[in-house]
From Swiss-Prot:
Descriptive protein name: Olfactory receptor 2V1
Listed transmembrane segments: 32-52, 59-79, 100-120, 150-170, 199-219, 239-259, 273-293
Organism expressing this protein natively: Homo sapiens (Human)
GO BP annotations listed: detection of chemical stimulus involved in sensory perception of smell
Matches recorded under PROSITE patterns: G_PROTEIN_RECEP_F1_1, G_PROTEIN_RECEP_F1_2
Length: 315
């Protein structure tokens, strides 16, 4: 068994990827790269806007900047290696590189799942207790929310990385995925993985199902508060406050829960790859668009930034 572990450590793995070199797949690969570029630029721009514009220094935008940072790190962890392997035709990844990719991926997905869940509490307080919002969502609370999201996500990532890399791998080293995804990697292990499967399921319940339950409970309370609002303008503002977050939640949790919480007998590598593309590339692109295009404050900050650049260039 040790011989196989050493061989895996030395030789690494092969990522079979999601694209072939057919004409159709070349078009799809180009589309993914466009999405990656938009995600990269959109999240970087949103982080800078929130940092530079004093009008966006509020709890909601602080959480949004952290969400954009997570999305930015997530796409940079997955897409560049996938693109390099596709363009070079090598498809290889080292054992250490695979472990690092797993650690970052699990940490970031877990952190984002928790942060989206805790952001629902922020929306609940904003709608249901607007007068107490500055007290209930003070700076210390905001730092605790983001800090706990990052901390638990990183702990989850380290646990799964150590557990996955500690298994013996023998026979085929071909991972049927476009990155080192834990469940695809486990299929190559020549040891009983039932304990790891249980650990993975427990982590998914804590990082996905529990925050999703918090979100549903928060929005049930928000709905009750909205129904009690008699002013049409206030009712519209309350819905606008929550709609962006609810859209992001649906996109992220829909794909992630489909990926990790459905029974194994319904799993197929092709389905897993498509679901992974959705929440590792598409969602990070859509989040900044959802929060900026539908938000007057962000668009206003962008216009002010462009005006400053234009005035500066004239001088």
């Amino acid at each position: 068994m040790g011989r196989w572990v050493n061989q895996s450590y030395t030789d690494g793995f092969f990522l079979l990827g999601i694209f072939s070199h057919s004409q159709t797949d070349l078009v799809l690969f180009s589309a993914v790269m466009v999405v990656f570029t938009v995600a990269l630029c959109g999240n970087v721009l949103l982080i800078f806007l929130i940092y530079l514009d004093a009008g966006l220094h509020t709890p909601m935008y602080f959480f949004l900047s952290q969400l954009s940072l997570m999305d930015l790190m997530l796409v940079c962890n997955i897409v560049p290696k996938m693109a390099a392997n596709f363009l070079s035709g090598r498809k290889s990844i080292s054992f250490v590189g695979c472990g690092i990719q797993i650690g970052f991926f699990v940490s970031l997905v877990g952190s984002e799942g928790l942060l989206l869940g805790l952001m629902a509490y922020d929306r609940y307080v904003a709608v249901s207790h607007p007068l107490h919002y500055p007290i209930l969502m003070n700076q210390r609370v905001c730092l605790q929310i983001t800090g706990s999201s990052w901390a638990f996500g990183i702990i989850d990532g380290v646990i799964q990385m150590v557990a996955a890399m500690g298994l013996p791998y023998c026979g085929s080293r071909s991972v049927d995925h476009f990155f080192c995804e834990v469940q695809a990697l486990l299929k190559l292990a020549c040891a009983d993985t039932s304990l790891f499967d249980t650990l993975l399921f427990a982590c998914c319940v804590f990082m996905l199902l529990l925050p999703f339950s918090i979100i549903m409970a928060s929005y049930a309370c928000i709905l009750g508060a909205v129904l009690r609002i008699r002013s049409a303008q206030a009712w519209k503002k309350a819905l606008a406050t929550c709609s962006s977050h609810l859209t992001a939640v649906t996109l992220f949790y829909g794909a992630a829960m489909f990926m990790y919480l459905r029974p194994r007998r319904y799993r197929a590598p092709s389905h897993d790859k498509v679901a992974s593309i959705f929440y590792t590339v598409l969602t990070p692109m859509l989040n900044p668009l959802i929060y900026s295009l539908r938000n007057g404050e962000v668009m206003g900050a962008l216009r002010k930034g462009l005006d400053r650049c234009r005035i500066g260039s004239q001088h």
